[in-house]
Amino acid sequence: MAITAAMVKELREKTGAGMLDCKKALVEADGDMNAAIDFLREKGIAKAAAKGDRIAAEGLTAVAVNGNKAALVEINSETDFVAKNERFQSLVQNIADAVLRNGSETAEAALASEYEAGKTIDTYISEEASTIGEKISLRRVALFTKEDNAAFGSYLHMGGRIGSVVVVEGTTDETVAKDIAMHIAAARPLYVDRSSVTEEEKAREEKVLTEQALNEGKPANIVEKMIAGRMNKFYEEICLVDQTFVKDPDFKVGKYVESKGGKIVSFVRFEVGEGMEKREENFAEEVMNQLKK
């Protein structure tokens, strides 16, 4: 497979490795980006790539809750200038409310659903985009349900740049649930617990850690123990219940929730623009573009 400059640039942005190392890794991996990242990690050239890659696009998240149902949405705009606009902020909350009301489980279903009589959410967004003067898109949605003996926790950070919702069963204490939602926003967990991690991801991490240990020249009889210890650290980084609780470092999140009589069932964390590229534009240009519209 031909290795392009764009591929080298992408790998460099994800790993921080040099251009020559990135090109060599892509050649070795026959253009497979994930395999190239693993190659660089095995050689000790790069750290694990962040799951979210670069945080790029602008916009906001919003949460809507009604009884035993909740919704989390992400709406993207082209510029931060528009994301701070009150009309855009109202649009984001209105869409969250509509998604919850309609029970839409995907962005595609949400766009086709009714916003108000005779108007879909897609049409509503198009009309508002025309007024605001910028492309606006509904990127993703998440729906949640709970039983009467459970609690929702939700949190919006940085005015909605990050949004999180968690379902905690066994307790109706919304303060506990909100504290966990705040932790999720700060600590970026990927899974609830170890059983949620895919076998593919476990095997991939074990392979990388094994190669790292062998490249460090460790004896084979020590490598196995090293891998076990490093896998535990890996789980503590990505599994919510294994993370050290931000609000009380004496607790792991799972143990803290257990001490309150609860158990974490599910969560979702949206950060605006995860994995999306942002056009290069400065604030002054943003203002000028708005004035021209």
Curated annotation (Swiss-Prot):
Protein name listed in UniProt: Elongation factor Ts
Domain of life: Bacteria
Role according to the record: Associates with the EF-Tu.GDP complex and induces the exchange of GDP to GTP. It remains bound to the aminoacyl-tRNA.EF-Tu.GTP complex up to the GTP hydrolysis stage on the ribosome.
Gene3D superfamilies assigned to the protein according to its UniProt record, in alphabetical order: 1.10.286.20, DNA helicase RuvA subunit, C-terminal domain, Elongation factor Ts, dimerisation domain
Disulfide bond annotation, renumbered to this chain: none
Originating species: Exiguobacterium sibiricum (strain DSM 17290 / CCUG 55495 / CIP 109462 / JCM 13490 / 255-15)
PROSITE patterns in UniProt: EF_TS_1, EF_TS_2
S-adenosyl-L-methionine is among the record's keywords: no
InterPro entries registered for this protein in UniProt: EF-Ts_dimer_sf, Transl_elong_EFTs/EF1B, Transl_elong_EFTs/EF1B_dimer, Transl_elong_Ts_CS, UBA-like_sf
Localisation per UniProt entry: Cytoplasm
GO molecular function: translation elongation factor activity
